[in-house]
Structures are given as C-alpha cells and as structure tokens.
A protein has these predicted regions:
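Beta-lactam-recognizing serine transpeptidase/beta-lactamase-like catalytic domain environment
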Residues: 68, 216-221, 225-229, 269-321, ...
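Periplasmic/cell-envelope proteins involved in peptidoglycan metabolism and beta-lactam response
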Residues: 1-293, 315, 398-408, 450, ...
Length: 616
C-alpha cells in the first residue's frame, strides 16, 4: 500500500533541496558575473593593471622654439586590500619624511568616496603625487618592505620662458566635477586648467595605456601577463604650434611692466595671434609642482588680478579707435561722402548738447577727421544717420542698421578665439535704449557711442580684430592662438574669411586716414619708421584718468602685423599706446629694434603708472 504521506514528504524535501541549489547557483552567478567587487578582487589576486600615462603634447612658438615640455615625475599608489595589516607604518613614514598623522589622514581621504568617488580596495589609488628624486630613490630601494604600494611613472609640465602665462595656461589635478564629466580621468590625474592647456586638453592629453602584470599568491610581481600581448601602449598627446612669436611676446611684457593693460598683435593674413600680453602677469614656471595650489591661491587672491587675461576678458570703452568703424558705416550707408565736411569748433555743439574736441581746422572732411581724431565729425555723422527718417523710417530702425554693421565687424559677441573665458563686450541696440529712455530718444541722446564712449565696450582682442579687418580692407579671420595641431587640419572656424557689411571703397578711405594720422596726425610718432605704418589713437574717458589706446597695422600695403594697445589710466593715446605699438611693429617686421627704438623701449619699461586703488 502506498504511503502518500511519505511520498508527499519526499516531494517537499526534494523541493527544498532544489530551491537551495537554485539559491546557491544564483549567488555564485552574482558573485562571479555580477559583482564588480568580486571581479576586482579576483583580478587583483593574480594581476596588477598598471596605468601607463602618455606624454602630454609639447607646445612650440611660430618659429619652432619650445615653450612647454614634459619632465619625468613619480606618483606613489596604494592598493588598500594588499597593505591592510601588513605595513610597518613607522618605517613607511620615515622613508617618506611624513608624520603618522599625515599618513592616517591621507588613507582616510582615499577611502572617503565623497572626496574620492572612484575608490576601490582592489585597485590602485593615489597616495602621493610628484615624489622628489631623493624620495623616489629611497622608496624604490625599500619598496619590497611596503606591500600594496607602487610607484607610478608619469610626467609634469615645464615652461621654458617666463612669458605668455595667460596664453599657455597651466595643468593641475582633476576636480570631482572633471571626473564626473569625463570618465577618462581618475583621482590624481592632471588636466588643463587655463589657457590653451585647457582649450586643447583632449588634443594634448593623449590616450592612457595599460600594462597587465602577473603576481604570485603572495602578491609579488612575476612579470608581464602573456608576455604583454594584452597590454595597451599609451598614445602620446599631439604637439601644438602657436602663432605666438616668443620674442615679440617678451618685448610686449617688458613694455607693460608697472602698468595695467593689454597688447594684442595679429597677423591679418591668417588671424593667428602673434602676441597676447596682459598686465599684470605671472611666471608660468611657478605654477608647477607641489606648490601649484599654494601659488594659484595667492594669485587668485591678489587684488591686481594677475590671473585675469585682460586681452579677452577686459571690457573697455574703445575711445577714438572706434571712429574707424563709424566712418565705414556712414560711407557705406551714404550718410557721408569722402568730401563731406562738418564743422568742429572745439567739439560738437547742437541744441544745448556739447561734446568737446581739441583744436584743429574747421570744417573738416573724412580723411583729416580720422587723422586728427575729430570728435565733432563722427558725432555729426551719427546724428544724421539716426535722424534720417526718409531712409530708415524711425530712429529704432536706423539703430538696428547701425548695430548690424557693428556686429559684422566682430563687436557685441564673442569672436571665438581658442582660449577659455572670452567676453563679448557690449554694443547697445534699439531695445536697450527704448527700455532706458521709455521710447523717447534720438541721435543726440546716444551721441557718445559715435566716438567709442557711452554704452560701447570692447575687449582689446576686438579692437585688434577691427585693425586686422581694416588692414584686409573688409574681412577678418577669427583670431586664434594655435596655428597647427600635429596630424590634424586647423579647424575651419579659423580658416574662413568673415566679410563685414562695409564696402571695400569705404575701407580704402579709412586706411588713407590712418596713414595720414601716422604721417602728420595723432600717430605722427610712427613717421620715424622706415615701414609704412597706419594708426589710430584713442583716449578713452574714464571715471579716473583716461585710458591710452592705440590700434594700427603695417605695412600699409600687404600688412603683416596688426596691433592693439590698451593701457589703463595711461592718458592720451600718444602717451603710451603709440610708442608701444610702434616698437612692437618694428620688432616683428625687422626682427630686432634699432638703437633708437631700444632706447624708447627701455624708457617705456621704466615708466610706472601710480594707480590710486589696489582694487581692480
């Protein structure tokens, strides 16, 4: 007779056994297949995956002079699982010259996932960066006594010259946000922080390699796994060639010593930046090594803001350099002809409004107005343009046309230079004034914008680009610091011509005015050079002392260099702007300074401006 109770019990026992087996299978599958910790642990028992860092790309000036290169460095890495309970902490600390408290603090920070998001007990973690040669030699001899610790070879940046800090930038350790944004990086990695080191990070950094090492049961390295068949060699970063002429850059930094301001020089033939000086500056060689963080904090807290690249971040009234853009607009729109003459009896005076000007013959026509930097002429031009209802219908529509010309010349928006932090400046529009004056305004209300004052603000780069556009008689290339990336064509952003709305005929008259200025006008100091220079001064009004501004290019035909100089509180454009611009152009065109120019450069270097406040 069948015992159904026994049979039923057998089914239950069998079912329980099957469930237990299934649970074990699932757990084993989870451990071996799904568990990341298990995989890392299993790997670490037999293998050591050692990251090999690529050589970061070198940086050269336009003449092939090495500006930035690499030096070998050594980081100390730790695998927590391997050192637990096996490390003689006192011996370890003595070998590195650190305290036990510092050791314990560092180990806690490594384990803190809020500070080290990529932490794992089974993979290498950064313990100490940039061991000195002495510490490396000592540690290498004793490394067998410190299980779980390894030396990782890499490189650090070295800067050949004390120049071009704002252009080159620097390299520092990655932040948490850097790691979150790009999984290429791990804690302790380096990344470009400023300048072209930041903008061209992906080109410069290269690709990491991996070396898989085989270990025995005690964790001792036995050699490469499968003779290195699975290793991945690092790929070096790409070298960059700049448009910068390091000798021209050095001269510019020398000339701006003791002054706040900027110099930007551009080759108008291709838009490459020949020099970019921002003063005050700093020595890029001091932002390397273990003291980088301390030095960077000091610079960032300095009230004179030496980290600020005024060439692309400073937004200033352009003063009379802006008159060239007005001449181009009035001529092309038919508001004036080259022979149109306006009165200027020490300024523009109409309906109780007066804008002052220095003494010169009156009435005056276009070329002489540019040469002598007449305020009245350009005020009259804007007044007639914005007041021409028969042509535009309203002041708002006329203002929109005016702004379209300004935008086509590269104002009011970022030009797109290959450096981080560029500012756009300010070009007002009709909506701006409608809001400010509740729709009740006219050409007299905004007359100061015609002479580069009022609401108009440009960066020194935009002023230089205006000069390059005039040098080219109507077009510009987006200014760029890098001329060549190793193995890659230059981005088409930097090789396309950008034409303005102004006519070529208008540009020819503006060039004539700038040449006249260099011969007999406000830039006549340039007449001593044996190359045909063209220039335009600016004296930008300011709440304190006026700013000294200059924009020019040379030679007049087939120009090779365009330059903008901006010296805060420097007074007349001829006081600082013209002499600085002149010697810079001579240095680039001739390759050296004449004795007379060297004497002038020495005098300019020695001149200091007493700034009344340390807050800039």
């Amino acid at each position: 007779m069948v015992d159904y109770k026994l049979e039923k019990r057998s089914y239950v026992i069998g079912g329980v056994a099957i469930v237990i087996v299934i649970v074990y299978i699932i757990r084993l599958f989870t451990l071996q297949i799904m568990s990341e910790d298990y995989k890392k642990n299993a790997d670490s028992n037999a293998f050591l995956k050692q990251i090999e860092f690529p050589s970061r790309g070198a940086i050269y000036d336009r003449n092939g002079k090495l500006m930035v290169y690499n030096q070998p460095s050594y980081d100390l890495m730790v695998v927590m699982k391997e050192q637990e309970g096996r490390l003689d902490t006192l011996d370890f600390c003595n070998s590195l010259g650190i305290t036990k408290e510092a050791f314990e603090k560092r180990m806690e920070d490594i384990k803190d996932r809020s500070k080290n998001p990529g932490y794992s007990r089974y993979t290498q973690q950064l313990f100490m960066t940039q061991l000195s040669d002495k510490d490396f030699s000592v540690f290498q001899e004793k490394m067998f006594r410190f299980p779980g610790f390894y030396v990782q070879k890499r490189s650090v940046r070295e800067y050949t010259y004390p120049y071009a800090a704002h252009v080159l930038g620097d390299v520092g350790e990655v932040s948490e946000s850097d790691i979150e944004e790009d999984d290429y990086y791990q804690p302790g990695d380096y990344i470009g922080k400023l300048g072209i080191e930041k903008h061209y990070e992906k080109e410069l950094r290269g690709v990491k390699g991996v070396k898989i090492l085989l270990r025995d049961a005690r964790g001792r390295i036995q050699g490469s796994y499968q003779n290195g068949k699975l290793d991945q060699r690092p790929v070096a970063g790409k070298d960059l060639t700049l448009g910068i002429d390091v000798n021209l850059q050095a001269l510019g930094e020398r000339l701006l010593q003791g002054k706040i301001g900027s110099i930007v020089a551009i080759d108008p033939r291709d838009g490459s930046v020949l020099a970019m000086v921002s003063s005050p500056s700093y020595d890029p060689r001091k932002l390397v090594g273990k003291n980088r963080g301390k030095m960077h904090r000091w610079l960032s807290q300095n009230p004179w803001k030496p980290l600020l690249n005024r060439s692309i971040m400073g937004q200033y009234p352009p003063g009379s350099t802006f008159k060239t853009s007005q001449a181009l607009t009035y001529l092309t729109e038919g508001i004036i002809t080259p022979g149109t003459a306006f009165p200027c009896n020490h300024g523009f005076s109409y309906k109780g409004l007066h804008v002052g000007c220095h003494g010169h013959p009156s009435p005056i026509a276009l070329v002489d107005a540019i040469s002598t930097s007449c305020n009245g002429y350009f005020c009259w031009g804007l007044y007639y343009m914005l007041g021409s209802k028969s042509k535009y219908g309203s002041v708002q529509k006329a203002m929109t046309v005016w702004k379209d010309y300004m935008v086509s010349m590269g104002f009011g928006y970022k030009l797109g230079i290959d450096l981080p932090g560029e500012k756009r400046g300010l070009i007002p529009n009709a909506q701006f004034y409608d809001k400010a004056y509740k729709g009740s305004w006219n050409g007299l209300t905004v007359i100061s914008i015609s002479i580069g004052q009022g609401e108009v603000n440009l960066t020194p780069l935009q002023i230089a680009n205006l000069g390059a556009t005039i040098a080219n008689r109507g077009y510009y290339y987006v200014p760029h610091v890098v001329r060549k990336v190793q193995g890659e064509p230059l981005d088409t952003l930097y090789t396309r011509r950008h034409y303005t709305k102004a006519s070529k005929r208008a540009y020819n008259y503006v060039v004539a005015g700038m040449r006249s200025s260099a011969l007999r006008g406000t830039c006549k100091m340039l007449s001593r050079y044996d190359f045909e220079a063209c220039g335009k001064t600016g004296t930008a009004q300011n709440r304190g002392h006026d700013h000294s501004v200059f924009m020019g290019f040379a030679p007049m035909n087939n120009p090779k260099i365009d330059i903008a100089v901006y010296v805060e509180n420097g007074g007349w454009g001829a006081d600082y702007g013209v002499p600085i611009g002149g010697v810079m152009m001579e240095q680039y065109l001739k390759g050296k300074l004449s004795p007379a120019s060297e004497s002038q450069a020495a005098q300019m270097q020695a001149r200091r401006i007493a700034y009344g406040s340390s807050s800039r």
